[in-house]
From Swiss-Prot:
One of its GO terms (cellular component) is viral envelope. This is Hemagglutinin. The keyword Ribosomal protein does not apply. Pfam families: Hemagglutinin. One of its GO terms (molecular function) is host cell surface receptor binding. Disulfide bonds join 9-472, 47-279, 60-72, 95-140, 283-307, 479-483. The gene is HA. The record marks 335-336 as: Cleavage. The chain crosses the membrane at residues 521-541. Keywords: Clathrin- and caveolin-independent endocytosis of virus by host, Clathrin-mediated endocytosis of virus by host, Disulfide bond, Fusion of virus membrane with host endosomal membrane, Fusion of virus membrane with host membrane, Glycoprotein, Hemagglutinin, Host cell membrane, Host membrane, Host-virus interaction, Lipoprotein, Membrane, Palmitate, Transmembrane, Transmembrane helix, Viral attachment to host cell, Viral envelope protein, Viral penetration into host cytoplasm, Virion, Virus endocytosis by host, Virus entry into host cell. InterPro entries: Capsid_hemagglutn, Hemagglutn_HA1_a/b_dom_sf, Hemagglutn_influenz_A, Hemagglutn_influenz_A/B. It comes from Influenza A virus (strain A/Chicken/Hong Kong/FY150/2001 H5N1 genotype D).
C-alpha cells in the first residue's frame, strides 16, 4: 500500500507585528521586528550638561551681563557653566543706547569658554582727577535711581577740568584677560563741554597687537531710552605678560573689572525661551534635552553636547526581522493523516516562536514546529552586529551651534544658511538611503537563510522524498520522530531509507503510468469517434447539395 504523506516543511517565523519599513524596491513592508533609529522626543527643559549647570541669562543679554547692566546683578559672579542661554530679545541689553563692537565675534569666543573669574584691574577710587561716580544715566535705573554699568566707569570732568588720562594695566596672570572699554558720543557740542570740558577729544588704546584711536561722533539723534547720546563698547583679549595702555582727554568709559578666562572648553550660546528643569543630559537643544542612543534626531538643528545627528526625516526605521506574512487559516480538503501543511511560500508560522527559521513535520506520531537554532542564532548575531555597526558609525557625536552675524554680514549669513541647509539635505538623503538599502539587504539576507535551510534538507533527502513546491517535502518512506530529527540536525542516513523509498517511488510511478494508459485509450477513442461523426455530417451535406 501507498505511504501516507509523512512530511517536513521549511518555514519562517511570523507574529502579530504591524511594524512597517521601506526598502529600495518597496514601501510599507510589514516585518516581524524593527528598530527605530530616529529620536523624535525631548523633555522641553534646559538641563545640566554632564552634571554642569548652564548659565541661563534670563532677561539679560550677553552684553548686559559682561558690562554689568544694573538689572543683571544676579550675574555679577557666576560659576562654571556648560553652555549659555540667551533669549531671542532679552529686555536687559545695553541700557544706555549704543553698540557693542565685534559683538558676534565675542559671542563666538564665548562658545569656547566655560568659566570667567572677574577681577578688578583699575579701581574706581583711583580716578582722583575725574568724577568717577557722576557718570550715571536714567537709562540704566537701579532701585528707582539713575545708575550705570557695573563693570566700567563713565569718567566726567572734575572742577571744570578733564586732565589727560594715561593709564596702563599689565596682565601678570597666567590666563588670558577679557578687557572692555567704551566711548561716549554726545548729542551736541554743548553736552560735550558740559561733560568733558574739552571740545575736541580722543581715546587711544594700545597693546602688543592692538592700535586703536577713537574720536567722539557728535550728532543729533532720535532718543532711545530717553537718550540722544550713544555709547560704543570695545573689547580685546590681553595675553599674559602683555599690557594695555589707555590715553584720553574725554568721552572715555574706562574698565574697572576684566574677566580672567580660567577654563576653556566646548560651550555655546543657545537661543531659547525655556526655563531650567533641574535635570541632567548629554545633549541639549533649544527645544529641550535629548536622552537617546539613537544616531539621528529631528528635533532642532542646533545642539550642544554628545548629540545624534540632526536630519529632516520624519521616520527612519531599520528592519531586524523578516517579512511578516502570517499564514492565513483557510478551509482545506484533508490530505493524508494530518492534512496539508503550508511552507514558507504560503506564509510564515506564528506557531514557531523560538526562532526565525525552522521546520514543521507531520508523521504517524504527530506534528509540530521546531526552530533551527543554529541558523537563527547566526542570523540574529549578523543582524545585531550590522545594526550596532550602523549606529556606531553614524553615532559620531555632533555639536551644531548657531552663528551670529552683524548687519554688514547679511550676505555671509545668507550664504552660511544655504550651506548649512545643503549639508542637512545631504545628511537627510544619506540617512534615508542608508535605511532603504540596509532594509533591502536584511530582508534578502533572511530570504537567503530560508533558502539555505531548504537546500540543506533537499541535499540530504535527494530522491527519498518529493518536493511539493511550497517549501515542503513528502517522504517516500516512513519517517518517525527520530528520522525527522536526523533531517533537522543534518545526520539523515540516506542509504538506510533509499531501498524502501525506491520501492514506494516505483509503486507511485506505476500508478501514474497505469492512469496515463487509461487516459490515452479514452483520448484515442474520443478522437476517432469525433472524426467519424464529422465525416458522416460532411457526406450528408454533400448529397443534399447535389440533389438540389
Amino acid at each position: 500500500s501507498l505511504v501516507k504523506s509523512d512530511q517536513i516543511c521549511i518555514g519562517y517565523h511570523a507574529n502579530n507585528s504591524t511594524e512597517q519599513v521601506d526598502t529600495i524596491m518597496e514601501k510599507n513592508v510589514t516585518v516581524t521586528h524593527a528598530q527605530d533609529i530616529l529620536e523624535k522626543t525631548h523633555n522641553g527643559k534646559l538641563c545640566d550638561l554632564d552634571g554642569v549647570k548652564p548659565l541661563i541669562l534670563r532677561d539679560c543679554s550677553v552684553a548686559g551681563w559682561l558690562l554689568g547692566n544694573p538689572m543683571c546683578d544676579e550675574f555679577i559672579n557666576v560659576p562654571e557653566w556648560s553652555y549659555i542661554v540667551e533669549k531671542a530679545s532679552p529686555a536687559n541689553d545695553l541700557c544706555y543706547p549704543g553698540d557693542f563692537n565685534d559683538y558676534e565675534e565675542l559671542k563666538h569666543l564665548l562658545s569656547r569658554i566655560n568659566h570667567f573669574e572677574k577681577i578688578q584691574i583699575i579701581p574706581k577710587s583711583s580716578w582722583s582727577n575725574h568724577e568717577a561716580s557722576s557718570g550715571v544715566s536714567s537709562a540704566c535705573p537701579y532701585l528707582g535711581k539713575s545708575s550705570f554699568f557695573r563693570n566700567v566707569v563713565w569718567l566726567i570732568k572734575k572742577n571744570n577740568a578733564y586732565p589727560t588720562i594715561k593709564r596702563s594695566y599689565n596682565n601678570t596672570n597666567q590666563e588670558d584677560l577679557l578687557v572692555l572699554w567704551g566711548i561716549h558720543h554726545p548729542n551736541d557740542a554743548a553736552e560735550q563741554t558740559k561733560l568733558y570740558q574739552n571740545p575736541t577729544t580722543y581715546i587711544s588704546v594700545g597693546t602688543s597687537t592692538l592700535n586703536q584711536r577713537l574720536v567722539p561722533k557728535i550728532a543729533t539723534r532720535s532718543k532711545v531710552n530717553g537718550q540722544s547720546g550713544r555709547m560704543e563698547f570695545f573689547w580685546t583679549i590681553l595675553k599674559p605678560n602683555d599690557a594695555i595702555n589707555f590715553e584720553s582727554n574725554g568721552n572715555f568709559i574706562a574698565p574697572e573689572y576684566a574677566y580672567k578666562i580660567v577654563k576653556k572648553g566646548d560651550s555655546a550660546i543657545m537661543k531659547s525661551e525655556l526655563e531650567y528643569g533641574n535635570c541632567n543630559t548629554k545633549c541639549q537643544t533649544p527645544m529641550g534635552a535629548i536622552n537617546s542612543s539613537m544616531p539621528f534626531h529631528n528635533i532642532h538643528p542646533l545642539t550642544i553636547g554628545e548629540c545624534p545627528k540632526y536630519v529632516k526625516s520624519n521616520r527612519l526605521v531599520l528592519t531586524t526581522g523578516l517579512r511578516n506574512t502570517p499564514q492565513r487559516e483557510r478551509r482545506r480538503k484533508k490530505r493524508g493523516l494530518f492534512g496539508a501543511i503550508a511552507g514558507f511560500i504560503e506564509g510564515g508560522w506564528q506557531g514557531m516562536v523560538d526562532g526565525w527559521y525552522g521546520y514543521h513535520h507531520s508523521n504517524e506520531q504527530g506534528s509540530g514546529y521546531a526552530a533551527d537554532k543554529e541558523s537563527t542564532q547566526k542570523a540574529i548575531d549578523g543582524v545585531t552586529n550590522k545594526v550596532n555597526s550602523i549606529i556606531d558609525k553614524m553615532n559620531t557625536q555632533f555639536e551644531a551651534v548657531g552663528r551670529e552675524f552683524n548687519n554688514l554680514e547679511r550676505r555671509i549669513e545668507n550664504l552660511n544658511k544655504k550651506m548649512e541647509d545643503g549639508f542637512l539635505d545631504v545628511w537627510t538623503y544619506n540617512a534615508e538611503l542608508l535605511v532603504l538599502m540596509e532594509n533591502e539587504r536584511t530582508l534578502d539576507f533572511h530570504d537567503s537563510n530560508v533558502k539555505n535551510l531548504y537546500d540543506k534538507v533537499r541535499l540530504q533527502l535527494r530522491d527519498n522524498a518529493k518536493e511539493l513546491g511550497n517549501g515542503c517535502f513528502e517522504f517516500y518512506h516512513k519517517c518517525d520522530n527520530e528520522c525527522m530529527e536526523s533531517v533537522k540536525n543534518g545526520t539523515y542516513d540516506y542509504p538506510q531509507y533509499s531501498q524502501k523509498a525506491g520501492l514506494n517511488r516505483e509503486e507511485i510511478s506505476g500508478v501514474k503510468l497505469e492512469s496515463m494508459g487509461t487516459y490515452q485509450i479514452l483520448s484515442i477513442y474520443s478522437t476517432v469517434a469525433s472524426s467519424l461523426a464529422l465525416a458522416i455530417m460532411v457526406a450528408g451535406l454533400s448529397l443534399w447539395m447535389c440533389s438540389n
